[in-house]
UniProtKB/Swiss-Prot annotation:
Swiss-Prot/TrEMBL GO biological process terms: chemotaxis; signal transduction
Periplasmic side: 46-174
Protein known as: Methyl-accepting chemotaxis protein McpN
Role played: Chemotactic-signal transducers respond to changes in the concentration of attractants and repellents in the environment, transduce a signal from the outside to the inside of the cell, and facilitate sensory adaptation through the variation of the level of methylation. McpN is a chemoreceptor that recognizes specifically nitrate and mediates chemoattraction. Binds nitrate specifically and shows no affinity for other ligands such as nitrite. McpN-mediated taxis occurs only under nitrate starvation conditions.
Claim: Cell inner membrane is one of the keywords in the record: yes
Top-rank taxon: Bacteria
Alphabetical list of Pfam families matching this protein: MCPsignal, PilJ
Gene for this chain: mcpN
InterPro entries for this protein: HAMP_dom, MCPsignal_dom, NarX-like_N, T_SNARE_dom
Transmembrane segments: 25-45, 175-195
Gene3D superfamilies: Methyl-accepting chemotaxis protein
Amino acid sequence: MNESVARVFDRILRGLGLKTLNAQFLLSYALMFGLAACASVALYLSMSISPETINVAGAQRMLSQKMAREALQLRLGAGDPKALAATIAQYERSAADLDAGNAERNVSRMGAPEIAAQRQKVAQIWGRYRAMLDQVAQPASQVDLRGFSQYSTELLGELNNLVSLMSARADSVQHTQMWIAFGCLLAILVLVVLGRQFGLAPLMRQLRGLEVALTEVGAANFTHALAAGHADNEIGRIVAGYERMRQDVSGLLANVKRSAAETDKDVAEALEQALGAGDQVARQHQDLDQVATAMNEMSATVAEVARHANHAAHSTRDAAALAHEGRRLVEHASSQTGALAEELEQTALALNTLHQHAGSVGQVLTVISSIAEQTNLLALNAAIEAARAGEAGRGFAVVADEVRSLANRTQQSTQEIQGLIEQLQDGANDAVAAMRGSASHAQSNLVEADSAAQALGRIVATVEELDGLNQQIATAAEEQSQVAQDIDRNITNVSGLSEQAHEGTAAVLSANQRVKEHMAGLRVVLGRFRT
C-alpha cells in the first residue's frame, strides 16, 4: 500500500517536472515554509483587533451614564459644568478613535459594515442626546426629563449593541485567523508525515538496499545486482554508478581468474617441458662424459702411433746406413726389412684402429649434434611458452635463451670437432695406404734378398723413400696428437657447458615450481571473490 501511494506521489511530482530528490524535497520545504508564513500572518492578524478597542467601546457606555448623572446634578445645582464638559469631550474622543483608529492608544478601526452602521446609528442618537444634555445641564430650561431618560436608555442600548458587534467581530476574526493558522500547521504536519512515510521511507529503503549491496561487495560478493526505480534522480545515479563499478570489477576479476587459470596451465606445461629438458641435458652430459673418455683413449692411441712412427723413422735411417755398407750386410738388411715389415703392419693396424676410433668419435659427435639440436628446439619452445606467460615467464625466458645459446655453441663446437675428425680420418687413410705400400716393399725385399746386391741401389732409394714417408707419418701423428688434445679440451669445455645447462635447467625447474606455488596462492585469493 505504502509503495503504491509512494509511486503515485512520485509520478505526480515527476509530472510536474520535479524528477530529482533535491527538487522534490525543495518543493516540500517551500510548501512548509509558505504554510508557516501563512500561519504566522494569520496569528498576526488574529491580534490586529486590540482589546483596547473593545475597552474604549465599553467605556462609552459608562461615559453615557456618567454624562446623564452629571447633567442631572448640574440641573439640581450640585454638579460641575467642567466635569460634564470633560466627560463629553472624552466620549467624543473615544467615538473619533473608534471611527478612525488611534495607534497611540492602540485602538484599531473596525470597518465591518454592520459595525459601521451601528456606529452611525449611535452617532445619530448621540447628536440628539448631546443637545438634550446641554438643556438638562441648565437649571432654568424646560426639558422633558422623561424623553431625556429614554434617549439615555436608547443610547446605552445601542452602545451595548455596538460593543456586542465589535466583540463578536473580534472573536470571529480571531477564530478565523486561528483556524487558518491551525490549518497551516496541520498541513505542515501532513507534509511532514507524507514526506516521512512516502518520501523518506522509500528513499531509506533504497539506501538500505544500496547498503546491503555495498556490504556484499565488502564481503567479496559481486553478484548482488541493484535496480534503480528512476535513472534520472540522485539515488538512480548512485545505483547506476554502483552497477557500473560492480560489473567492471566483476569482469576484471573474471578476466584475472581466467588469466590465472591459463597461466597456471602454461606454468604446468613449462614445468613439464623443463623436466623433459632437464632429462635431455642430463643424458647429454652423460654422453659428453663418454665422448671425453673416448677422446682420452684416442689421444693415447695417437701418441702411440707417433711413437711407432718415430721408431719406424729411426729404423729406416738405420736401414739406409746399413744399405751403404754393402752386400755383406744384405742378410742383416733382410732381417731388418722383415722387422720393418712387421712394424709397418703394426703401424697399419694402429692406423686402422685410429681410423675406427675416429669413426666412433664421428658417431658420438653426430649424437652430440642431434642432442644440441633437440636442446635448441626445446629452448626455443620454452622461450615461446615464456613469452606466452608474459611477466610471470620473463625469468624462464632468460634461462631458455641461455640454454639455446649453449646448445648453439655446443653444435658449433661439435661441427668443428667433426671437421677435425674428418681430417684425422683422411690422414689415417693416407697413412694406412703408405704403410701397406711399405709392407709390400718389405715383402718384396725379403723375396728378393738374393738379388740384394744387384738391387742395392734400388734398396737404398727405397729406404730413403721409406724414411721420408716415416717422417711424414711421424709429423702427421704429432699433428693428430695435437688435434686430439684440442678435441679433448673442447669436449671438456662442452661438458662444462652441459653442466651449466643442467644447473640452469634445475634453476628453471625451481623457478617454475615457485611460480606454480604463487599461482596456487593467487587462486586461493581469487576464490574469495564471487562474480
